């Protein structure tokens, strides 16, 4: 496209002025001198990494993970921390619920000796700690557990029964405006865990909503809805959960994909089970009757034995995972993305409250 010479000179002058005032890189052409690929961190689940389209959760962005109680929200975030620490990244956990179990975290592969942990007294304190860690540029992943536990200072200092309408929503709205830019500059991933509430008086449509107003919904680049879909049993004993995660919002790839995987009690996500299932689905692992084979060699009779074989032979498991990632992620990325579809609601954009 040919640009008028006078406009070109004026544009060059104003770009130079902006860069001089705000620093190099403060404004540029979209396709110029920047990587179009988004840096990501694995979720610990290959199926979910593929569903996200980019191979994991995006750095420099806000992510919301929500679902019912005991659905696997904290487990998923601990898996993200473990994956990030394996890459040498620094992680922090803001435990607003005061419920983090270090023994369980260690079982999932988290290096708790190098995990920063804070148990703030108020919501404002938690968000200020988040902002300070972000601005330092030294922390790569921050988890906030949970939005529902971020209680405003005024509510804590008040009496039980006092009305505090919109306080939490206003606090979150102010925090999002402040955090979003800092996260991008420091390339920090901020994950909020959230709980589900029921809208009162809803006759049609989904009555479920999340706490903290709507500001987080707008600022989040990725929103994950995690649900427990069944139980995993060994005989009469329940040893884990069948879990489904739906990507309800995705600004880095196509949304509305879903992933199914298993969470085993005391172990976390069943990665080798995923490798067996995905390997068979994509013809990487052969299944003949009850026998599973890889490259002509039998690896086990029945899914449980094949899973056990891969758990004991980590080199073969790593080879299968690498092949599956190359195969699936090259096809899963999309040229466009869409935000989640919201209902026709009147929204106070300051507090995020629906009225």
Swiss-Prot record:
Binding sites annotated in the UniProt record for ATP: 67-74
Keywords: ATP-binding, Cytoplasm, DNA damage, DNA recombination, DNA repair, DNA-binding, Nucleotide-binding, SOS response
GO CC aspect terms: cytosol
An annotated Gene Ontology molecular function: ATP hydrolysis activity
Listed CDD domains: RecA
Pfam families with a match to the protein in the record: RecA, RecA_C
SMART domains, sorted: AAA (SM00382)
HAMAP family: RecA
Known role: Can catalyze the hydrolysis of ATP in the presence of single-stranded DNA, the ATP-dependent uptake of single-stranded DNA by duplex DNA, and the ATP-dependent hybridization of homologous single-stranded DNAs. It interacts with LexA causing its activation and leading to its autocatalytic cleavage.
NCBIfam families given in the database record: tigrfam_recA (TIGR02012)
Family: Belongs to the RecA family.
Protein name, as recorded: Protein RecA
Protein source organism: Shewanella amazonensis (strain ATCC BAA-1098 / SB2B)
Gene: recA
């Amino acid at each position: 496209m040919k640009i008028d010479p006078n406009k070109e000179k004026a544009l060059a002058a104003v770009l130079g002025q902006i860069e001089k005032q705000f620093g190099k890189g403060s404004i540029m052409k979209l396709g110029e001198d920047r990587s179009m690929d988004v840096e990501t961190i694995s979720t610990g689940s290959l199926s979910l990494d593929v569903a996200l389209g980019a191979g994991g959760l995006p750095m420099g962005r806000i992510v919301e993970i929500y679902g019912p109680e005991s659905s696997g929200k904290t487990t998923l975030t601990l898996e993200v921390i473990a994956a990030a620490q394996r890459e040498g990244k620094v992680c922090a956990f803001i435990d607003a619920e005061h419920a983090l179990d270090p023994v369980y975290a260690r079982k999932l592969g988290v290096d708790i000796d190098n995990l920063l942990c804070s148990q703030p007294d108020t919501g404002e304190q938690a968000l200020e700690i988040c902002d300070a860690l972000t601005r330092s540029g030294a922390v790569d992943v921050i988890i906030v557990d949970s939005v529902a536990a971020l209680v405003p200072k005024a509510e804590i200092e008040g009496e039980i029964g006092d009305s505090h309408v919109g306080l939490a929503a206003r606090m979150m709205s102010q925090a999002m405006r402040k955090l979003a830019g800092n996260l991008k500059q420091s390339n920090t991933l901020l994950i909020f865990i959230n709980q589900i509430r029921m809208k009162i008086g809803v006759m049609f449509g989904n009555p479920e909503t999340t706490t903290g107003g709507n500001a987080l919904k707008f600022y989040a680049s990725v929103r994950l809805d995690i649900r427990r879909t069944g139980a995993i049993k060994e005989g009469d004993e329940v040893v884990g959960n069948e879990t489904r995660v739906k990507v309800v919002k995705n600004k880095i790839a196509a949304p509305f994909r879903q992933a199914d995987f298993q969470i085993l009690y005391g172990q976390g996500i069943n990665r080798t089970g995923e490798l067996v299932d995905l390997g068979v689905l994509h013809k990487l692992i052969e299944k003949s009757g009850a026998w599973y084979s890889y490259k002509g060699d039998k690896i086990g009779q029945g899914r449980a034995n094949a899973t056990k074989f891969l758990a004991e032979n980590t080199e073969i498991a790593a080879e299968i995972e690498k092949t599956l990632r190359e195969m699936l992620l090259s096809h899963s990325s999309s040229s466009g993305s869409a935000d989640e579809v919201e209902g026709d609601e009147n929204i106070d954009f300051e507090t995020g409250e629906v009225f």
